[in-house]
């Protein structure tokens, strides 16, 4: 309603009093009324109020209804509408210099190269120009669409359909009384009866017919029976009309096409906001992004992978100081492949590189190259490398490169062919670099084994940087990074706490450690603790390892007793076997999918003997043996234990060559989720493998049964104590079973003994001392924040 009235009144006549109102000191909706502002204007508005009083009254109603419209003045009127704080301090002599528009700002404001931020009040500018407040192009489109819809609605739903009658009624009421002017046979389906003007109130009536021949015979017979002379008989006219069914059938198709066209125009592939301006032809443009200086990750935030950090620092140094290497005849490596398990910090290391290196950093995901259109992948690869050459020297990071870098020749479907074409284009582009391009390509993947050899060869990715799970020193460094933002208890030392937590989390990756610290803070907040304490971290570690604690899960007394003796069997076997992992805690409170939970502290070692693996198998069978020994029956609770025992036995026989009958051979096992189409050994060998696995598992079971038979009283003690307390710590186990008869390591200092210093070696080589600044800078100017390493 506002737009309609303003347009009718004339925008120029209404714009002048609006500007006077703002000049006189404020918004009508934020403290006063429009008429008070008018009185404050004085003589300036006295001559114009007679002509525009109605417009001002309308503005007063609207401002009281929606003050948000006037909470911010339009552009061009900021100096007339100042904040209350600035009104007192502002003086007539102070002038604000006009804001300089950006060089490449779009029509919407000063947002940058691609249009930037739009106007807050575009309708006000149009009113100043004497135009309607709405956009003409959009209004014309909407007007045409609305007119078409209205016309169709009026035609199909408001036309007079006439009154339907029967043949008998037509003969008796119209034909016999001589009220018929003419008969119109429409589309050979029905007859429209046009009465003589002035005889009836209806314009026409109609009735259906079976066929034209039958209608003609019946009409002739009826007129003969009524004695109507041939000269007075009703005229019959045959016409063809459209009933709109064809147009109605086209409506769904037209609506669907309109929606698709609108989506293509306004969406990412169209020319609307956020589009690249090329419609369907823009799908071949790269989706790679050039990261700006708003990356808040630095190398100081990356720990536990110092060797990989040195490699990445050297790549940045290649681009910053190429002369240092070219003087010795060295060539800049073209790329590096970051590999390793999930959560070890590959992408985080790339983010830190983007935050530290003051060279352009271009990032893209491997899955963004493959789309529904054929040829999009190679086109985007070409466009991406063209962008990289344009911004050289720069770093190009391709995350999850296995999406396009899989080995070729493994499929014949269209998607596989498109992936191979994208990979071929990638190979060509990487080979097309010369030594002066100064573009370094980094890539990250969790599956280096499935990559094409042509992609990983030297000359494309010269270096393979493996980032594995951190050791105990690396975990301590990672804990220090993630403990920084936490509000710890005043009695806790970050160094001591990080070392203790590192000893409690063997095998954890950087992502797991980050999750532990976050869970500890959440647990502390859940209990309204003023700070994060050590017990919160212990609970968080149990939460990550064992899953969610289910204290409300109801177990039958018999089931609870079975679970208690099952866990007691695990604990006792591990306590009296030399190569078993030390026990930290055992609980019969359900966690995750399990009904019981035991936490061990495994040693970090890379080489295992046959005796060590055999003791681990015995420890995993302790629960099943305890059930058989104390209850005379077995349950399904040992399913996960049996699966691990079977995997360990097959690995010893098939992969590690620890079987005397099978010999010193090793066969590959399929990965989890993969299927082995063809076995690499014969049926006789497969039968021998199965026999050896059964024999090994049987030996472990018999040894475990013998051990628990000897320690039956100890298992009974642990089982009864578990039923009483539900959770047993290591101190409780020492009280019940006595000290463990074998030496074990449990502290950080014991684990790192004999490995040099207590912390990671973070020293840099001489050539990388000033890795993040050019030699020509002379040590005075730095690109970005230097790494503290």
Curated annotation (Swiss-Prot):
Bias regions of kind Basic and acidic residues — which residues?
A: 767-789
Q: Where in the cell is it found?
A: Mitochondrion inner membrane
Tell me the membrane topology, using the record's own terms.
Multi-pass membrane protein
Task: Spell out the molecular function terms from Gene Ontology.
Answer: ATP binding; ATP hydrolysis activity; ATP-dependent peptidase activity; membrane protein dislocase activity; metalloendopeptidase activity; zinc ion binding
- What is catalyzed by this enzyme? ATP + H2O = ADP + phosphate + H(+)
Task: Please list the residue ranges that the record marks as compositionally biased, kind Gly residues.
Answer: 106-115
What is reported when this gene is inactivated? No visible phenotype. Conditional deletion of both Afg3l1 and Afg3l2 in mature oligodendrocytes triggers progressive motor dysfunction and demyelination, leading to rapid oligodendrocyte cell death. Conditional deletion of both Afg3l1 and Afg3l2 in mature oligodendrocytes also causes premature hair greying, due by progressive loss of melanoblasts that share a common developmental origin with Schwann cells.
* EC class (word): hydrolase
The active site consists of: 567
Judging by the UniProt lineage, the source's domain of life is Eukaryota
The EC number(s) given in the record are: 3.4.24.-, 3.6.-.-
Function, as annotated:
Catalytic component of the m-AAA protease, a protease that plays a key role in proteostasis of inner mitochondrial membrane proteins, and which is essential for axonal and neuron development. Afg3l1 possesses both ATPase and protease activities: the ATPase activity is required to unfold substrates, threading them into the internal proteolytic cavity for hydrolysis into small peptide fragments.
Subunit-structure text = Homooligomer. Forms heterohexamers with Spg7 and Afg3l1. The m-AAA protease is either composed of homohexamers of Afg3l2 or heterohexamers of Afg3l1, Afg3l2 and/or Spg7.
Q: What is this protein called?
A: Mitochondrial inner membrane m-AAA protease component AFG3L1
What organism is this sequence from?
Mus musculus
The taxonomy runs:
Eukaryota, Metazoa, Chordata, Craniata, Vertebrata
Q: Which gene encodes it?
A: Afg3l1
